[in-house]
Amino acid sequence: MVRKSPGSGKEEDFTFISPVVKYLLIFFNMLFWVISMVMVGIGVYARLLKHAEAAMACLAVDPALLLIGVGILMFLITFCGCIGSLRENICLLQTFSICLTLVFLLQLAVGIVGFIFSDKARGKVSEIISNAIEHYRDDLDLQNLIDFGQKEFSCCGGISYKDWSQNMYFNCSSENRSQERCSVPYSCCLHDEGEAVINTLCGQGMQELDYLEAGEFIHTNGCIDRLVNWIHSNLFLLGGVALGLAIPQVTKHLRAKLIYTWRIGIQV
């Protein structure tokens, strides 16, 4: 769209930005802004409910910290986008655009690195799972997450059900006086579909059995192999989800760029 500045004979080129673009950007940023505050609130609430010693012992595998971290990052980015587009502030719009670009490139880089260095990625996943097993009883959120994963993937432990010996309560050593000695969590057990009441002691003493004997009562395969197989069989689905996450980022980036370019044009 061509406009003429009053009192000057020069023509200046401005790109017309529809109010729809502006208010769509504001709407989506406000939506994710609210979501980010909810995530931070849930994460902080979950952290406050935990005992101080237990909370400090398993910081690396605490789902609450992940919620808080992602929530704060999302809050800051959407704050720049929302206020920047509402006030048409060039600095905030540029910051928002750069942040979205960095997040998108980071997601892309993680996917590529994970694919190229799959062995190292597998080792890192194994390390995270081992750490989670070690702190299974220290954090209720982590415990629920592990139980959910083992039930969903029909697995037990990282590499095998024997990995549960890494936990001080399930350890098979003679020094361990726990009632759960040499056992596995109930989420490892084979359950009948029509079973009304779940026996939480079904994993008692399972680590003392060999694979064939234990296989009659619990899942003996590790969760790492199950997870890798699930990823391989759902590559197209995961690709679609990744694309679905990328499209809003790209469109918001483009809208921010349009408004930013428009504002620069007006100030020329």
UniProtKB/Swiss-Prot annotation:
Keywords: Cell junction, Cell membrane, Cytoplasm, Disulfide bond, Glycoprotein, Membrane, Transmembrane, Transmembrane helix. The chain crosses the membrane at residues 24-44, 64-84, 96-116, 227-247. One of its GO terms (biological process) is protein localization to plasma membrane. Residues 1-23, 85-95, 248-268 are cytoplasmic. GO terms for cellular component: adherens junction; cytoplasm; plasma membrane. It is found in: Cell membrane; Cell junction, Adherens junction; Cytoplasm. It is a multi-pass membrane protein. Residues 45-63, 117-226 are extracellular. Disulfide bonds join 155-223, 156-188, 172-182, 189-202. Glycans are attached at residues 171, 176. Pfam families: Tetraspanin. Belongs to the tetraspanin (TM4SF) family. Homodimer; disulfide-linked. Part of TspanC8 subgroup, composed of 6 members that interact with the transmembrane metalloprotease ADAM10. This interaction is required for ADAM10 exit from the endoplasmic reticulum and for enzymatic maturation and trafficking to the cell surface as well as substrate specificity. Different TspanC8/ADAM10 complexes have distinct substrates. This is Tetraspanin-33.
